[in-house]
């Protein structure tokens, strides 16, 4: 009796899945008239027009300014007085340095 019940359940599941798949397939007959009246070039122009219209609506809240121009950008670092390789600029005198000019710069001095 349980084997017959399992077969009926399997048949019912198979029937439901089959009906679902058949029902889910699209019927392209509905799109036949719409596709015939426009060429691919016209479809591309229509898509481009819709994208421009959407872009205009997206920027309307900011007075037409694109969002990338409204982003806050980090300011650049202030100019440093140190030159490369740990040397100072010409305005610093040799007497102001804490060590002799010929001394080798340490690891921390090269940052």
Swiss-Prot record:
Which residues does this entry mark as bearing Phenylalanine amide? 85
Main subcellular localisation = secreted
Q: Which residues does UniProt call coiled coil?
A: none
Q: Which UniProt keywords apply?
A: Amidation, Neuropeptide, Secreted, Signal
Tell me where it resides.
Secreted
What is this protein's function per UniProt?
Plays a role in controlling food intake and regulating body size.
Q: Which GO terms describe its biological process?
A: neuropeptide signaling pathway
Tissue localization of expression? Expressed throughout the central nervous system (at protein level).
Signal peptide range = 1-24
Q: What is this protein called?
A: Short neuropeptide F
Q: Propeptide-annotated positions?
A: 25-76, 88-111
Q: Which organism is it from?
A: Camponotus floridanus (Florida carpenter ant)
Q: GO CC terms on record?
A: extracellular region
What family does the entry list? Belongs to the NPY family.
